[in-house]
């Protein structure tokens, strides 16, 4: 909202994302407020987009082609000095650069964020060097604990993951971006296939009283003996996806794979495919 205030209370949606990106990329901030990933029109923050919608629902913003402040409140005065200086720096340096000119500026400076753009050929006359991505079949695992949706998706993009396999029993999260519907749509728009395999999850009722590593080990031993034994067909389907050349990532909540049942799944799959899992 302070960014909108700096730009006279109104910005086109694409410009808003680009200016916010530049504030994070080129100026010193008190912390990383938003992460960005390469999307349809360059750097994009799902979290920032969600925040805009939330503020619109509260009546503080209006959203159309442009994002507009509804009230002339001094949001800048609420910021730390370093953050206020960053936003004012973006305005001073880029206020005359808008629309396609702003997109071209960002694409030229930060080609990583242009790799998924639908309009890259229209914006840039010259070719830019895009990051080279691994294409060989691989197996990964990733937890979203401690990650924003943008950081999480950026990790998948960086590893060129083609299939994301959700092994949660109940794919619902209070954390924005990680409930099934939102995660499905986000990955789909990035060209990543999302598959939910609830049969590989653990019932919530069995996750009580897990206080020590030994508690988790006992739970996962039981999981192997009961669940993995009766889901051999599902595990074979994962192996088949790998054999087709996909770069697979198994996902759940816990960041540390030792405290997540996906480590037992990957252990089983490793024996079948002769490949070591990279835990992201």
Question: Where are the predicted features?
Answer:
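A short beta-strand-loop structural module common to alpha/beta enzyme folds
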Residues: 19, 163-172, 196-198, 279-280
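Internal catalytic-core helix/loop-beta-alpha segment
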Residues: 214-249
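Short, surface-exposed acidic-centric catalytic microdomains
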Residues: 174-216
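Short, acidic/polar
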Residues: 145-156
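Short Gly/Thr/Asp-enriched flexible loops that form oxyanion-binding sites at enzyme active sites
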Residues: 179, 259-270
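Acidic beta-strand-to-loop metal/phosphate-binding motif
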Residues: 163-170, 247-255
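Short, basic/glycine-rich phosphate-binding loops at helix/coil junctions
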Residues: 130-134, 210-221
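Domain-edge interaction signal
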Residues: 1-145, 271-275
């Amino acid at each position: 909202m302070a960014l909108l205030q700096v730009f006279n209370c109104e910005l086109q949606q694409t410009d808003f994302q680009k200016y916010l990106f530049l504030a994070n990329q080129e100026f010193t901030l008190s912390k990383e407020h938003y992460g960005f990933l390469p999307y349809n029109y360059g750097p994009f923050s799902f979290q920032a987009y969600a925040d805009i919608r939330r503020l619109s629902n509260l009546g503080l913003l209006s959203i159309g082609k442009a994002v507009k402040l509804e009230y002339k409140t001094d949001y800048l005065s609420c910021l730390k000095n370093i953050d206020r200086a960053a936003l004012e720096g973006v305005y001073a340096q880029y206020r005359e650069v808008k629309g396609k000119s702003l997109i071209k500026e960002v694409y030229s400076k930060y080609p990583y964020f242009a790799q998924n753009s639908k309009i890259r050929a229209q914006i840039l006359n010259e070719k830019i060097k895009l990051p080279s991505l691994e294409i060989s079949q691989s197996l990964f695992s990733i937890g979203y604990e401690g990650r924003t949706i943008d950081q999480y998706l950026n990790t998948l993009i960086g590893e060129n993951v083609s299939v994301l396999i959700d092994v949660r029993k109940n794919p619902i999260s209070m954390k924005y971006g990680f409930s099934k519907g939102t995660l499905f749509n986000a990955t789909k728009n990035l060209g990543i296939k999302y598959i939910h395999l609830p049969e590989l999850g653990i019932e919530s009722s069995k996750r009580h009283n897990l206080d020590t590593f030994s508690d988790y080990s006992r739970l996962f031993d039981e999981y192997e003996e009961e669940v993995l034994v009766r889901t051999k067909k599902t595990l074979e389907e994962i192996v088949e996806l790998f054999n087709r050349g996909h770069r697979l990532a198994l996902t759940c909540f816990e960041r540390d794979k030792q405290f997540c049942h996906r480590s037992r799944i990957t252990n089983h799959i490793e024996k079948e495919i002769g490949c070591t899992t990279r835990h992201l």
